[in-house]
Amino acid sequence: MNENVIKAALLGFGTVGTGVYKVLKNQEKEMSAKIGCKVEIKKILVRNIEKAAAKIEDASLLTSHWDEIINDPEIEIVIELMGGINPAREYILSALEAGKHVVSANKDLIAVHGHELLDAAHENKVDFLFEAAVAGGIPIIRPLKQCLAGNHMTEVMGIVNGTTNFILTKMTQEGMEFKDALALATELGYAEADPTADIEGLDAGRKVAILASVAFNSRVVFNDVYTEGIAKITSKDIHYAKEMGRDIKLLGVARNEADGIEAYVCPMLIPSSHPLATVNDSYNAVFVNGDAVEDAMFFGRGAGELPTASAVVGDVFDIVRNILAGCCGRIGCTCYKNIPVKKMEDTHNRYFLRLKVEDRCGVLAEMTAIFAKYQVSVAQIIQKDTKVEGCAEVVVITEKVREGDFRTAIEELRNRDSVRKISTIIRVYGK
């Protein structure tokens, strides 16, 4: 290693890769002063060199051959920004086994194979850091691992997908319906051409798996996380929520309960007074609770070229400091506990239920009898003025109930002739 230069390689030169290159170049002098040496990008792995060459002054940095990176002893840090499971997994494992440190922003990979990658880093006495894999530019992985390490963490929850938060903000503030807000998000570049991963909660689910694993020191993988999206939310639901002093947000929730970990993503009604209710547009926020710190919230841009690059470069600098101090690879995977992850039907929540029923005497009594049969306590029943074709619209708010019991009650309601339609079911955050 040159005393004044540590060399790195970028895998991928898309939005985030370009951002990382820009940050390292633009802040070169200041960063050198901060950490005592320069970080230099020696190689950039791309699929299409001709296309990538248009985005960089020195095209000699570009390569389409992994061997030029893995076999170069001068390259000490590999920055993986390719996305996807393979070949990213193979590249990262081979880099770690070759004694190279790795920074990754790959939530898809880490949510499934994070344990394997961290163990490989520990075995080879190198670092594997992934701050940018969750919530872009918001520092949350490092605080959970370091600043909050003295806490028993009980809850990590938040808004961790900017696309869906933008859509719900437009629906709330401008009365848009879902499809119109999605079209606007696509037009402005917040939503991908195929928005499924965002609007169905899959993107947020991967982040919840990572957050839960780090916060609770127990392995949670993506398949453990229940996911539900926002496509069924209507402006009417948002209006009724507002009448009750609540907002609808797509929340990623992880709780460390006495009988296991709860991990899920779904739309939820939260009090308008809750700090997360004020997080709008494409911003993200993560709210944590620990036995010592109590409540804390981290807020900022959850995606984008430079916010995500900020987190990646922060990890690079941490590794450089460790290299200079000779203390790399000290801690591997911290999932030393074996806490079971609960099935969604065994979680407990309150529920908002909107349905259309026959407009006649006795229907509400029938409903409450069915709820009572399955131990579903009703906090509130509101019959709305809306009446169409002999039907009345009813809103029900339950107390906390086991989800499996609630689902069984709902199925019985669906089979009643007096219940014409169950329009919406949304979980309610809080007591």
Task: Annotate each predicted stretch with a short phrase.
Residues 153-157, 165-168, 172, 184, ...:
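Catalytic, metal-anchored helix/loop core of enzyme active sites in primary metabolism
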Residues 101-103, 378:
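A short hydrophobic/small-residue beta-strand
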Residues 88-98, 107-145:
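Rossmann-fold NAD(P)-binding glycine/threonine-rich loop
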Residues 180-278, 283-285:
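Substrate-binding/catalytic subdomain of NAD(P)-dependent oxidoreductase enzymes
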Residues 47-49, 67, 107-108, 115, ...:
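Short, ordered loop/turn segments at secondary-structure junctions
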Residues 316-431:
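A conserved regulatory-domain signal marking ACT and ACT-like small-molecule sensing domains
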Residues 1-98:
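N-terminal glycine-/serine-/threonine-rich beta1-alpha1-beta2 phosphate-ribose binding loop
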Residues 122-203, 210:
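Rossmann-like NAD(P)H-binding beta-loop-alpha module
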